[in-house]
UniProtKB/Swiss-Prot annotation:
Keywords: Amino-acid biosynthesis, Aromatic amino acid biosynthesis, FAD, Flavoprotein, FMN, Lyase, NADP. NCBIfam families: aroC (TIGR00033), PRK05382.1 (NF003793). Reduced FMN (FMNH(2)). Its EC number is 4.2.3.5. PROSITE patterns: CHORISMATE_SYNTHASE_1. InterPro entries: Chorismate_synth (IPR000453), Chorismate_synth_AroC_sf (IPR035904), Chorismate_synthase_CS (IPR020541). This is Chorismate synthase. Pathway: Metabolic intermediate biosynthesis; chorismate biosynthesis; chorismate from D-erythrose 4-phosphate and phosphoenolpyruvate: step 7/7. This reaction introduces a second double bond into the aromatic ring system.
Length: 393
C-alpha cells in the first residue's frame, strides 16, 4: 500500500511529505521532482508569489544513489518567503501578536468553517494550512509515483479543458503529442484560439479584481485491466480517483469518461462495445480485447478495463478576490468586506499538475495492490505473469 502524509503551513518554513510503501529500486532524482514542481508554478494568471518561490525538493530519506530503498521517503520543499513571516508564523509564544489577527472570513474559503470547528479567533490558523500552497509537496509525491509507473509503461498527463467558460478541443493525435503541445502553452492548452480567449478573460478578471476557474483533464495511458475491484465500495478505482481529485483545494466536481453526458444519452450511445483481436498482446490494451470508443473513461465496474483512463475535474474560481465580497468581522460581528490574501487570478494550469500528481499516486497504489512486491524486480515478475495469463483469455 502506498500512502503519504503532508505537513506544513503556507508561510511556514517548509512543506514536508512522508511516503510509505514505495518499493525498492525505483530510480528517483531531485531533478525529476523539480521538473514537476516547476510545471506547477507555471501558468497564465498566477500571482506574485510565484516570483518569490522557486520550488526545489530535498530528498531527506528513502533514496540512496538515485534509487528508492523501500524505507519511508521524506520530501521537503522550502518556503522561500519564510524569512518575512518568521515572527508571524513562529512556534514560540513570545511572538504572539493578536493585533494582527485575521478576523474577516472569505466566502468560499475554509476560514469560517475552520474557525467555528476548531475555536480559533485568528483565521490565519486556518488559512495557512488550507492554502493551496500545500499542493506543492503533493506534486512532489506525485512525481515519485510517476517514476514508479513509468517503469511499467504507464504515463500520466493532461490538458486544461476549460477556463472561464471557454472550452478547448484537442487535435486528433496521440496523447503524447497532445501533452507535448500543451506543455508549450502557458495555459497547458492545445487549442490556440481558445487559449487566446482564455488569456483575454484572465486579463479582464485581473483588471476587475475577480478570479476564474475551469476544467482540467487527466489522462493515464498504459494501464492494464484489473486495477481496483468491484467487490467492495472502497476498492472501486473510479471512487478512489474521484476522492483523490476532490481532495485538491477548490475542486468541486469530477467526471470519469464522458461523465454527466451519460445521463443525457441512451445506453446504445454510451457503452463501449467489446472486440477481440488475437494479434493484440499488450496488457495495457486489455490483452486481445479492445474498444473503438472510450466513453467509460477506461473504468468499468470499479476496475480499469485496459483503455486510457480519462478524468476531468472542475475547479471553482479562487475565493480570494482583490475586490472582496461581503462578509462579517468575527471579532466585532459587524459587516465588512472579506480579508484579502496574496493570491492568483487563475490557477487552473497549476490545478492540472496537482491533479496529475494525485491521480498518479492513486494509480500507483492500485498497481501495487495488484502486483505488489518489496522491490521493482518482484513487481515486474508478478506483472509479467499477469500479462501472460490474460493473453490466453
Amino acid at each position: 500500500m502506498l500512502r503519504y502524509l503532508t505537513a506544513g503551513e503556507s508561510h511556514g518554513p517548509q512543506l514536508t511529505a512522508i511516503i510509505e510503501g514505495m518499493p525498492a529500486g525505483v530510480p528517483l532524482l531531485a531533478e525529476d521532482i523539480n521538473r514537476e514542481l516547476a510545471r506547477r508554478q507555471q501558468g497564465y494568471g498566477r500571482g506574485d508569489r510565484m516570483k518569490i518561490e522557486k520550488d526545489q525538493v530535498e530528498i531527506l530519506s528513502g533514496v540512496r544513489w538515485g534509487e528508492t530503498l523501500a524505507s519511508p521517503l521524506t520530501l521537503v520543499v522550502k518556503n522561500r518567503d519564510w524569512e518575512n513571516w518568521s515572527t508571524k508564523m513562529s512556534s514560540l509564544p513570545e511572538f504572539r501578536d493578536e493585533s494582527q489577527a485575521v478576523t474577516r472570513p472569505r466566502p468560499g474559503h475554509a476560514d469560517l468553517g475552520g474557525a467555528l470547528k476548531y475555536g480559533h479567533r485568528d483565521l490565519r490558523n486556518i488559512l495557512e494550512r488550507s492554502s493551496a500552497r500545500e499542493t506543492a509537496v503533493r506534486v512532489a509525491v506525485g512525481a515519485a509515483a510517476k517514476a514508479l509507473l513509468r517503469l511499467f509503461g504507464i504515463r500520466v498527463g493532461g490538458v486544461v479543458r476549460e477556463v472561464g467558460g471557454v472550452v478547448a478541443t484537442d487535435p486528433a493525435a496521440s496523447f503524447e503529442y497532445i501533452w507535448a503541445s500543451a506543455g508549450q502553452s502557458p495555459l497547458f492548452c492545445c487549442d490556440g484560439a481558445a487559449e487566446q480567449e482564455m488569456k483575454r478573460l484572465i486579463d479582464d478578471a485581473k483588471g476587475s479584481g475577480d478570479t476564474l476557474g475551469g476544467v482540467v483533464e487527466v489522462q493515464v495511458i498504459g494501464v492494464p485491466p484489473g486495477l481496483g475491484s468491484h467487490v467492495q465500495w472502497d476498492r472501486k478505482l473510479d471512487a478512489r480517483l474521484a476522492m483523490a481529485l476532490m481532495s485538491i483545494q477548490a475542486i468541486k466536481g469530477v467526471e470519469v469518461g464522458i461523465g454527466f453526458e451519460t445521463a443525457r444519452r441512451p445506453g446504445s450511445q454510451v457503452h463501449d462495445e467489446i472486440f477481440r483481436d488475437a494479434a493484440r498482446t499488450g496488457a495495457d490494451s486489455g490483452g486481445a480485447y479492445y474498444r473503438t470508443s472510450n466513453n467509460a473513461g477506461g473504468i468499468e465496474g470499479g476496475m480499469s478495463n485496459g483503455e486510457a483512463i480519462i478524468l476531468r475535474a472542475a475547479m471553482k474560481p479562487i475565493p480570494t478576490l482583490y475586490k472582496p465580497l461581503r462578509s462579517v468581522d468575527m471579532l466585532t460581528h459587524e459587516p465588512f468586506q472579506a480579508a484579502v490574501e496574496r493570491s492568483d487570478t487563475c490557477a487552473v494550469p497549476a490545478a492540472l499538475v496537482v491533479a496529475e500528481a494525485v491521480v498518479a499516486v492513486e494509480i500507483a497504489n492500485a498497481f501495487l495492490e495488484k502486483f505488489g512486491g518489496d522491490s521493482v524486480q518482484e513487481i515486474r515478475r508478478n506483472y509479467q505473469g499477469y500479462c501472460e495469463r490474460i493473453r490466453t483469455l
